[in-house]
Every structure is written in C-alpha cells, then in structure tokens.
Design a protein with these regions (language model features):
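Short, solvent-exposed loop/turn segments at the edges of secondary structure
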Residues: 73, 112-114, 281
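Short loop/turn segments at secondary-structure transitions that flank enzyme active sites
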Residues: 82-87, 116, 125, 147, ...
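Short helix/loop capping segments that flank catalytic or ligand/cofactor-binding pockets
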Residues: 80, 86-90, 98, 128-130, ...
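Alpha-helix initiation and N-capping motif
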Residues: 14, 49, 59, 75, ...
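A residue-level signal for conserved active-site and pocket-lining positions in enzyme catalytic cores
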Residues: 78, 141, 286
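Assembly-associated, polar helix/coil segments characteristic of icosahedral protein shells
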Residues: 1-108
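Extended oligomerization regions of viral-like shell subunits
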Residues: 157-293, 301-312
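Alpha-helical scaffold segments that mediate packing/assembly in large oligomeric complexes
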Residues: 98-191, 304-312
C-alpha cells in the first residue's frame, strides 16, 4: 500500500496515531489510511517522522553530507549521469550540434531494505498523560535507526542492506595502497580526487585515525591538521566510529564529495505496538520499520586509502 503523506499530515491522524501508541480507543477509519498491510504498522505522522530524522542527524553525520531522496512509489529506479556536461561555441547561423547522451547514464536499481527497531516502555509511563511519549519514541528511534544507517552507509554489503562506501565492488574507488599512513599518502589521496569533487570534499575517518593525522608533519615541521578549524588541507573532517582502524587491508580514510552517495527513502517510518510480548514485565513494546536504500552513484566522487595487507 502506498502511504499518502497528505493523510499523515492531518491533525486527526496525528491524534489517532498517538492514541494507538498509548493503547487508547482509536478511530480505525482514520488510522487505517496510514496502515502498512505488509508489516501491520502505521506510518508516523509527518511531524513525528521529521523529529525522528532530526534525532538521527543530531547523533550521526552521514545524512547531513549525503543526498536524501524520497521515492515512496513502487518500482522506482534511479539514473545517475556519469558524464560531464558539454558546452560548445557555435558560429552565428551554424547548426547546433546534438549531443547524444543516452549511453552516459548508469542505471542504479534501488531496493527497499527493511530496518527494524524495538523500543520498550513501562506501562506506567504509557498511561501517564503527562509523559511525552512522542518525544521519547522519536528520540529513541532516531538513535537506533541512525546508528544502523551510518554503519550500513559505510560498511554495507548491498545484500539485504544499503551498499556502503567501503564496499569493494560498488563503493568508492581506491586511490592508493600504502604500507603506512604518512603525510605523502594523505596528500596523494587528496589530489587523486578530481577537482570537480574535491571542491566540496570532506574527510571521513574514525577517532584513532584522526589522532594519527593530527601528529603528521611536513618536512618543515608544519602539521597537516589545522587545529584552529579542524580541517585537513582546508577541508572538513567528519569522524565516524564505523570507519576502520589503520590496519592490514583496511580502508581507514575516505575523501571526496559525499553528495554523490544517495540515501533513498522508500517508505516513511512506521510503528505498531507489541502489547502481549512484554506483558510479564509490565512493558509495552513498539516495533518500528524504515524502508530505504543507499548507494554511491559516482564511484570516482569519493576515494579511499587502503593499507597494504601484511604478509605472514
């Protein structure tokens, strides 16, 4: 069933949804318009769904630097144009050349990977009219969804989950393989990225790698990392716990334009109550789903350093 976001934006739907979350009497004729028959869940009201996304972005950075697209209809495919746009000077009165670009599109099939989360809450809180259940659920779901999303957008295999930027086959291009992470290797990575993508380039690494880079100096003793702005070569650094350490065979640093990583939302966040599962604990469970996919649509837009594998 395709969810009509105009319905989930209505105040009456919002009231009935939160009545359902509190196990109160609801108007099924209103609530059923937001029901996903495949999961038995109800789409969150638009305002609450936005709060979930805000909670994700508060804790995790990948959605901030990627391109987020809504594609709620079934059967969607996206097309990424991999060619550079072409312009030519044309003499007065001369024919304008027709540029055939149909073959320059790479077709990227977008799946609907299901991300699930369960949040539990004591019945006393649920029945307390003064307890802000919307704030609690949106923040909890934002944190759990955000953590799973970020890990998948970086390390995902593409099978039953998004394709991460570190995926060997469909992720970012490997710019170089280095025995160790030194000043020259970082400079080589920077200039391996085409100027088109370098202009909006961002560094991605974990805390341990950042600590190593903070200590790197050039031949004149100048630090690679600018502590005043927390930048490397003038470009922002983002830290993620899901980037690997500097170790054999790993890809500890990614650099490039992350807007070419597309996060495609296939269905809005939806929730249903689990009344019986936790009854012995005087709790109510909330099962939530998010359907989405993620892919790097231009492999050359982001490059990585790979640490050479040690021979045993």
């Amino acid at each position: 069933m395709e969810i009509n976001t105009q319905i989930t934006a209505q105040p009456e739907y919002d009231i009935q949804f939160w009545n359902a979350m509190r196990s109160k009497k609801t108007r099924e004729d209103v609530l059923d318009k937001g029901r996903d028959v495949s999961t038995g869940t109800y789409s969150m009201p638009n305002a609450a769904a936005r709060k979930v996304m805000a909670a994700i972005e508060k804790e995790y950075d990948f959605r901030k630097i990627a391109t987020v697209i809504r594609a709620y209809k079934n059967g969607y495919k996206i097309f990424a144009k991999d060619c550079k746009d072409k312009a030519e000077f044309v003499a007065e009165g001369a024919a304008i050349p027709v540029y055939e670009s149909a073959g320059d599109f790479n077709e990227n099939t977008i799946e609907s990977h299901k991300l699930a989360s369960i949040v539990k809450l004591d019945e006393d809180f649920v029945s307390d009219a003064g307890f802000n259940i919307e704030k609690y659920l949106t923040e909890k779901l934002g944190k759990s969804f955000g953590r799973a999303e970020d890990e998948a957008f970086i390390n995902g295999t593409g099978k039953e989950e998004p394709t991460g930027i570190l995926n060997d086959e469909n992720g970012a291009d490997t710019a170089l393989t280095a025995e160790t992470l030194n000043y020259d290797a970082v400079i080589d990575l920077y200039f391996s990225v085409d100027k088109e993508y370098r202009k909006n380039g961002i560094w991605l690494m974990n805390d341990k790698t950042a600590l190593t880079l903070r200590k790197l100096k050039d031949a004149d003793g100048n630090y690679l990392w600018n502590p005043a702005s927390d930048t490397i070569l003038g470009k922002q650094v983002i830290l993620s716990e899901f980037m690997p350490d500097i170790e054999s065979g790993a890809k500890p640093i990614a650099f490039g334009d992350f807007s070419y990583y597309w996060i495609v939302e296939r269905k809005p966040v939806s929730v249903r109550t689990l009344l019986e599962k936790y009854v012995l604990y005087d709790q109510i469970g909330y099962l939530a789903f998010e359907l989405l996919d993620g892919k790097l649509v231009r492999k050359e837009a982001i490059k990585v350093i790979k640490i050479a594998e040690t021979k045993e």
